Structures are given as structure tokens and as C-alpha cells.
Amino acid sequence: MKKPLLLLLVAYALPALAQTHYPTAVADGLEKMAAPCVQAKGSPYFKQALTVADLNIDGLPEYIVDGSRFVCKGAESAINQDGGGTVEIYTGQSDGGARLAFAHAAHGTYLKDDYSYAKAEADIAAGGDPKTAGNLSRLYLIVSGELCRKNSETEPESPCMRPLVWNIEKRQFEFNGVHATIGLSESK
């Protein structure tokens, strides 16, 4: 199927998404995710799969695409049905664009919003909006296997949550430590 026709099908199937302006890189990522669904004559549904938050505290949005939350109505078998998917994070750029800064398979995501008084003071001192000053968002991926630092021969396979951190030098997100303290029931 040619790209213009696929774009037309995605735009027809996703009027809310088509009316919202996302950076080209994000729209291309969503289109790639929707392609098998559209080709199977399903209707892509991204409402739960796309989240916008400032994860690297630069004042620009990050676009979190969680493949485990993508739904293909009418052609469910066209997409991964094992409860997982690829998580992609696109970092917002000052020119309004975005670039891919992380991609990894996961069982899902958990976005934790928090507040920092130190960040609030810095935000307000820099002329930031007092209503949003101090807001922090941290993204956790629900993963399993070696990422949970478990010995597969002696420990049962069970998921854990791993936080992502921003590596400013590499300009990408990376895994940081094992965090199983946040209950997995909160992530759904």
C-alpha cells in the first residue's frame, strides 16, 4: 500500500488524531504503528497509546507512544495481542519538531506525576507559569527478564518497573535501576 493512501486511511480512521498537529516524527511513528491495522481493514485507536509530558524538564513536550495501549478495532488480530508493545519516546524540539530518543519493547508504561519545591522556585524565577511550576513527570516501563535483574534459572518470571532517566550528554532516555515499589496494579 502506498504511503499517501495509508495516510488517507489513517486520517479517515482517526479524525481526532488527524485534527491534532503532532510533529512529523511522532505522526510517522503513529502511522507505522497503525499500518498493519489499516491494512487489515481495522480502525486504529490511539487515545490511550499517546501521552504528552515533559520528561526531561526542558520545558518542551515529550511524546510517549505506548504500543501496549494501541487498539485496532475490528481487526484485533492484526496487532500484537500478548499484552506488550514497543514504547517510543520522542523529545520535543525548540523548532516544534520532535526526534526519537528511546524505543524499547515493554509490557506497558506508568507515568508518575510529582512535584518539586526546588524546581518550582527555579521555574518561577525563570519566568515560568506558577500554575505548572514544579511539576515533574517520571516514566516507568513495565518489563521482565534480564531488565528485572532476575536469574531466569532460579527466580520465576515476573514483571518489574524500571524508571527512565534523561542522559543529557547522549540526548536520549535510558533505564535506571529496578523499581518494584510502585504496584503494577497502578499502571493499568
Task: Kindly label every feature range from the protein language model.
Residues I64-C72, T86, I142-C148:
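Generic short beta-strand segments
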Residues Q19-T24, G74-H104, S158, R162-K170:
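Beta-propeller blade repeat segments, especially FG-GAP/WD-type strand-to-loop junctions
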Residues G59-V65, L136:
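Glycine-aliphatic tripeptides that mark coil-to-beta-strand junctions in extracellular
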Residues M1-P4:
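Positively charged n-region of N-terminal signal peptides that target proteins for export
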Residues A13-P15:
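N-terminal signal peptide c-region/cleavage motif recognized by signal peptidases
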Residues L50-D58, D129-P130:
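Acidic, divalent-cation-chelating loop motifs in proteins
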Residues R99-A106, F175-T181:
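Beta-propeller fold detector
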Residues A18-T24, A35-Q39, D113-K188:
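Acidic, small-residue rich beta-repeat scaffolds with periodic aromatic anchors
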